[in-house]
């Protein structure tokens, strides 16, 4: 896998968005002509190594769209966007979830998946797990199965994996 290359293209930005936070910036990875492709290929290899065989990919707004579409293309699968409220034109399911300061919601079309689908959730970052768990809850409202979740990065020590206990969770890089 290209993990050293991928990690080298993620910039560490201290004190952003506030003092004491080390922000992991993926824009240099995306700006590299090979960055997105190598990341999607590494994700596909991780899935193969774990025996995960999804039938469709779901990506959480907004950076999950970038990596999710790229991975879906590598896997030859379709892609479903998990959106912020009010962005989808047809009937939706919605899940509200808590943030550090307040709450937010995510939505998907009610007919986004078939009950036989094995859905792979893709996002750039696993931190506390709140957004990922809300995405899982949405998928399960459709009666589809969650095949697994894959992230480009995981921040250790923030309990994201514990929130997703019982699901197959992978991350390419841990910080």
From Swiss-Prot:
Enzyme Commission number(s): 2.4.2.7
Gene name tied to this protein: apt
Subunit relationships: Homodimer.
Subcellular location: Cytoplasm
GO BP annotations, alphabetical order: adenine salvage; AMP salvage; purine ribonucleoside salvage
Job of this protein: Catalyzes a salvage reaction resulting in the formation of AMP, that is energically less costly than de novo synthesis.
Cellular component annotations (GO), alphabetically ordered: cytoplasm
Organism: Francisella tularensis subsp. tularensis (strain WY96-3418)
Organism lineage: Bacteria, Pseudomonadati, Pseudomonadota, Gammaproteobacteria, Thiotrichales
Pathway where this protein functions: Purine metabolism; AMP biosynthesis via salvage pathway; AMP from adenine: step 1/1
One Pfam entry name: Pribosyltran
Organism superkingdom: Bacteria
Full protein name: Adenine phosphoribosyltransferase
Cited HAMAP family: Aden_phosphoribosyltr
Coiled coil (UniProt feature): none
InterPro entries: Ade_phspho_trans, PRibTrfase_dom, PRTase-like, UPRTase/APRTase
CDD domains: PRTases_typeI
Reaction equations catalysed: AMP + diphosphate = 5-phospho-alpha-D-ribose 1-diphosphate + adenine
UniProt keywords, alphabetically: Cytoplasm, Glycosyltransferase, Purine salvage, Transferase
């Amino acid at each position: 896998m290209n993990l050293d290359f991928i990690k080298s293209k993620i910039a560490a930005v201290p004190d952003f968005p506030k003092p004491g936070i080390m922000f992991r910036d993926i824009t240099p990875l995306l700006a590299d002509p090979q960055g997105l492709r190598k990341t999607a290929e590494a994700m596909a290899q991780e899935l193969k190594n774990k025996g995960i065989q999804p039938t469709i990919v779901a990506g959480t707004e907004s950076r999950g769209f970038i990596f999710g579409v790229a991975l879906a293309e590598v896997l030859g699968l379709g892609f479903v966007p998990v959106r912020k409220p009010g962005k989808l034109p047809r009937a939706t399911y919605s899940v509200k979830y808590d943030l550090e300061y307040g709450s937010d919601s995510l939505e998907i079309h009610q007919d986004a998946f078939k009950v036989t689908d094995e859905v792979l959730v893709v996002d750039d970052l696993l931190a506390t797990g709140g957004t990922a768990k809300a995405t899982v809850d949405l998928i399960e409202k459709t009666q589809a199965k969650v095949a697994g979740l894959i992230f480009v990065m995981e921040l250790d020590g923030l309990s994201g994996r514990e929130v997703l206990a019982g699901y197959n969770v992978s991350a390419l890089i841990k910080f």
